[in-house]
């Protein structure tokens, strides 16, 4: 085994949530007077913790988002998850293989613990992720692109950073893994390869990943 721990991003890597979330985010920001297209939401906010969305909107417009922004946004997202969320193609087979081969793994997401739980329950991925394998930006002081979340996950899992590999689909996540001095495999299903500069290796389907990890 090349690594002692596989650290997965969640949204867009394990659960196919990015199209849902960014469609809702773009529409809600536009509704609030901050015109945003789906493509702009993907470009600017994919992989971000909620506080970073607030910071970017205020930086660009000089206006604060409403105090209930997070609650309204998550309410809309969770309702959509219940209707249509699916695992990323190949995620179930990959997790089955890692579990069968006794490869240690966890998830480290910019999303809240509630968002992770809702997504995993809806897609059936919760069977592979007990609480000890789930880490959120809520657990640390700084979210991606800071290394804190990945370093926290490695520490909690008892693995040295240099023995970890991160699986990411966002530029922020790749930067965070680089800052943590971990190898990172960049998933290009949603993000152009050119935007994942710094990735140790790129792949386009989860079916390719098992062979890269051994």
Task: For every predicted segment, state its role.
Residues 17, 89, 109-112, 170:
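Helix N-cap/beta->alpha junction signal
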Residues 35, 104, 183:
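Residue-level detector of anion-binding/catalytic polar loops
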Residues 1-4, 96, 112-214:
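Asp-based, Mg2+/Mn2+-dependent phosphohydrolase catalytic module
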Residues 14, 87, 105-108, 142, ...:
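Conserved SAM-binding loop
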Residues 2-101, 117:
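N-terminal helical cap/lid subdomain that shapes the substrate entry/recognition surface
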């Amino acid at each position: 085994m090349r690594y002692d721990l596989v650290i997965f991003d969640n949204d867009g890597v394990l659960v196919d949530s990015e199209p849902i979330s960014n469609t809702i985010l773009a529409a809600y920001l536009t509704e609030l007077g901050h015109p945003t297209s789906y493509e702009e939401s993907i470009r600017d906010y994919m992989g971000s913790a909620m506080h970073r969305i607030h910071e970017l909107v205020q930086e660009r417009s000089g206006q604060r988002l409403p105090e209930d922004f997070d609650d309204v946004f998550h309410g809309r997202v969770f309702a959509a998850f219940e209707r249509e969320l699916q695992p990323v193609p190949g995620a179930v087979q990959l997790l089955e293989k890692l579990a069968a081969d006794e490869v240690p793994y966890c998830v480290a997401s910019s999303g809240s613990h509630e968002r992770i739980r809702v997504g995993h329950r809806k897609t059936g991925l919760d069977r592979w992720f007990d609480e000890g394998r789930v880490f959120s930006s809520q657990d640390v002081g700084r979210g991606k692109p800071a290394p804190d979340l990945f370093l926290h996950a490695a520490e909690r899992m008892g693995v040295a950073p240099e023995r970890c590999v991160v699986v990411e689909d966002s530029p922020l996540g790749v930067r965070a893994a680089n800052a943590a001095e971990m190898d990172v495999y960049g998933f290009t299903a949603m993000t152009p390869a050119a935007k994942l500069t710094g990735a140790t290796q790129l792949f386009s389907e989860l079916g390719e990943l098992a062979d890269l990890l051994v």
